[in-house]
Each structure stands twice: as C-alpha cells, then as structure tokens.
C-alpha cells in the first residue's frame, strides 16, 4: 500500500514505506474510469525498485475539488500580513469550505517581520481557530507550526505570493520549489506552484500539500442562505435566540441575536461578519441562478 504524492505526465508517483514508485494504473482501473488523485491511498504492485502498478484505490475519507486532493485532515490557510494585503474574505471562504468538509482549520499569518498585526490573530482566535504568526525569511520552521502539522495530512491554501512555497521549502529544505515574488504591478505571485503535490515531513511524520495559488475558491455544494451561519463557529446556536428562529439570515432582521448580542459583545469580529455577509450574498445569487 502507498500514497499518491504526485501526478506527472500520466504517471502516479506513489510513496510506500520503503520506496517512491513511478506507476501506471492497472487496466481495470482505466476501464472503470477510476482515476487516482494526489492523497489517495492505493494498492500498488512493484515491478522493480522504482516502478509499479496501481491496482486499487482505497475508500477516500474525503475529496477536495479545488485543489484536487484526497484524504485531507486539516487546511492551513496561509495569509500575508502585507504584500499582498490579507484577503480576509478568501481566508474565511477557505475556512467555511473546511467546516463543510469536516476538516480542522488553521490560520498562518506569514511575513510578520514586515508588519505585526495582533488584531488579525484576535479575529480568528475569537472564532475558535488556531492562529500562528511567523516569518518564513529564516530557518527553522516555527515549532508551533510543526506541532500543528504533526501526524496530519494538511493542505496549504491561500492566494499567490503569500508564501506557501516558501513555507514548504522551510519545512523541506531539500526541495527545489520555485518561490513566487509579488509583482509590484499586479500584486500577484510570480513563478509559483503550478500543480498539487504532497511532501512528506519526516520531522513531524506529516504530509503537506502545496497548492497552486488562487484568488478565489468555489464554495462547496450544499451551502444555503439558511445554513451558511452553521459554518461560522462563533455563530453556532445564535439562530435559536433570534426572533425569527430558523428563518433569520442575520442580515438586518429585527431581533437578530447576531446583530444585537454577538457583535455588540465582540464575541464575533466585525471582519468575520463582513465576510459572512459577502458569502451570504454569493450563496443567494447561486440559489437564484439555480431556480431561473
């Protein structure tokens, strides 16, 4: 048995306990149109010391669609303090996706050597998320981050230029990844990761998936204007205290517990509520388009 860590030119690179094998899929898999993805646990038969054949894909614990990776246990959202400015709606979009999929969410704020912003830590710790402040300009990797990754299969997510590839390089110094600089003109990362790949971190017995930089992540299926609040942990249970109960969408209704209790008490950060409203509007537009 092994884990698919990379797809390249029609080959599946499978990490077993003793070797890294370059594999093709067995014919019955191709006929069944079953395609292994990065993160899959597979049954593999070695042909020699470096090549093998994938015979079966074991049942998946979960499957992320974007990035396409299977059997993930947590999502680490990497965001920069500056250059580029933190896109908190993107951070919250990823965290909502993690909540829907039942994955643990962690937020890592990179480039804290450029500008310390403790208020960002407070926003997400208040929501119950683990927040790590660090700098990727010098080794070794923050011990707090290694503790979070230990024994997990983690996906690194975040927009281009925030330092995901730099983080993987810091965790795995032997790797030769292209590190993206942020273009002064476009504020986008350059020369960044173009594919999903799992990297094994021997120091903490973990797998980390570096993902292509993106500026937008599609919301998972099943989200509605009624259940979106369930995926904001600080809003759990608020609806039962709203005047309109399950019909309250927390966007201006009279007697809304979120607006009359959570926000005034600072139990929910205004930035998170702003993200909620933005995502709520997006979900509403999706619902309207489905019923046209």
Predicted regions and their residues:
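Structural detector for short beta-strands of small beta-barrel domains
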Residues: 1-8
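Short aromatic-glycine-enriched beta-strand elements
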Residues: 10-14
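A short macromolecule-binding patch
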Residues: 20-27
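Helix-rich effector regions associated with P-loop NTPase G domains
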Residues: 27, 33-48, 58-75, 80-81, ...
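Short, Lys/Arg- and Gly-enriched loop/turn segments at beta-strand edges
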Residues: 49-57, 85-87
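Canonical P-loop GTPase G-domain recognition
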Residues: 111-162
């Amino acid at each position: 048995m092994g884990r698919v860590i990379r797809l390249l030119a029609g080959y599946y690179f499978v990490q077993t306990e003793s070797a890294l094998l370059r594999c093709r899929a067995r014919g019955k898999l191709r006929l069944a149109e079953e395609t292994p993805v990065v993160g899959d646990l597979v049954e593999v038969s070695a042909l020699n010391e470096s090549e093998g054949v994938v015979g079966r894909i074991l049942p998946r614990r979960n499957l992320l669609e974007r990035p396409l990776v299977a059997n993930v246990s947590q999502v680490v959202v990497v965001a920069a303090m500056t250059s580029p400015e933190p896109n908190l709606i993107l951070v919250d979009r990823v965290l909502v996706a993690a909540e829907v999929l039942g994955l643990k969410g962690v937020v890592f704020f990179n480039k804290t050597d450029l500008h310390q912003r403790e208020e960002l830590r407070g926003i997400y710790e208040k929501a119950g998320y683990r927040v790590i402040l660090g700098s990727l300009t010098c080794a070794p990797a923050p011990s707090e981050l290694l503790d979070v990754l230990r024994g997990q299969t983690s996906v690194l997510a975040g927009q281009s230029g925030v330092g995901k590839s730099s983080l993987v390089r810091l965790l795995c110094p032997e790797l030769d990844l292209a590190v993206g600089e942020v273009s002064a003109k476009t504020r986008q990362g350059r020369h960044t990761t173009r594919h999903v790949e799992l990297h094994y971190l021997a120091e903490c017995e973990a797998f980390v998936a570096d993902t292509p930089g993106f500026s937008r992540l599609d919301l998972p299926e099943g989200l509605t204007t009624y259940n979106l609040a369930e995926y904001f942990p600080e809003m759990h249970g608020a609806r039962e205290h709203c005047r309109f109960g399950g019909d309250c969408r927390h966007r201006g209704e009279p007697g809304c517990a979120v607006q009359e209790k959570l926000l005034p008490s600072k139990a929910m950060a205004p930035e998170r509520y702003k993200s909620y409203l933005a995502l709520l509007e997006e979900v509403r537009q999706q619902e309207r388009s489905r019923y046209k």
